[in-house]
Amino acid sequence: MGKKDEKSQQGEELVKVNKWDGSAVKHALDDAVKTCLLGDRPQLKEQFGLVNTRLALCALAVSVAIMAHAWDFTHPFPESRPVLLFSVLAYFALLGILTLHSSFREKGTFAVALQKDKERERLWEASSDMRKYDDKYLLTLSVRDTKNGKRREQSSNKSCAAFIDQNGIVLDNLVANEVNRLFNALAADKKNASSLSSN
């Protein structure tokens, strides 16, 4: 492969975002963190429980709406009134559950991975937060032992300018450095805890 091909390949891998769009910046950084966390660590297997729960709730809400529409079509109002009333209540109840799930369970979590070894299983989670009109990107990496429930976390709160250049290009190497720093800190705590327990 020639130099031109290498340059074109590198250019295709670059991610460019509108640096003035906070939502786009956050999602681009989330994708870069997820790629670094899971792509460089084959021992981590991505889990989709949170996403599947959200999709199931959305599917149920849509199914209720479709059922109400179909029932009203075959049984015109006012005969369909009880079914429509039930459907409206069920729809908003499901939306409420979905909101609670997103606010209190997901909490900005965009990556979940399971690490299995001979001794135990550990659940890794990556979450982020970036408030509107704020340039601070808060990244939190946590690990939880599935047996005893002990949870540890490391956080990084830096300006998004630390990971994106003036042209809006996401600097994957700088993102990887930050992710590796948090991951290694948690891994070091994990090793220290295991050595203390063995002593």
Curated annotation (Swiss-Prot):
Coiled-coil regions listed: none
TM region(s), chain numbering: 50-72, 82-104
Family matches, as Pfam families: SPC25
Lumenal compartment segments: 73-81
One example of a Gene Ontology biological process annotation: signal peptide processing
Membrane topology field: Multi-pass membrane protein
Superkingdom of this protein's organism: Eukaryota
Subcellular localization: Endoplasmic reticulum membrane
One cellular-component annotation, GO: endomembrane system
Cystine residue pairs: none
Keywords: Endoplasmic reticulum, Membrane, Transmembrane, Transmembrane helix
Family per record: Belongs to the SPCS2 family.
Subunit structure and binding partners: Component of the signal peptidase complex (SPC) composed of a catalytic subunit twr/SEC11 and three accessory subunits Spase12/SPCS1, Spase25/SPCS2 and Spase22-23/SPCS3. The complex induces a local thinning of the ER membrane which is used to measure the length of the signal peptide (SP) h-region of protein substrates. This ensures the selectivity of the complex towards h-regions shorter than 18-20 amino acids.
Purpose: Component of the signal peptidase complex (SPC) which catalyzes the cleavage of N-terminal signal sequences from nascent proteins as they are translocated into the lumen of the endoplasmic reticulum. Enhances the enzymatic activity of SPC and facilitates the interactions between different components of the translocation site.
PANTHER family: MICROSOMAL SIGNAL PEPTIDASE 25 KDA SUBUNIT (PTHR13085), SIGNAL PEPTIDASE COMPLEX SUBUNIT 2 (PTHR13085:SF0)
Annotated protein name in UniProt: Signal peptidase complex subunit 2
Gene: Spase25
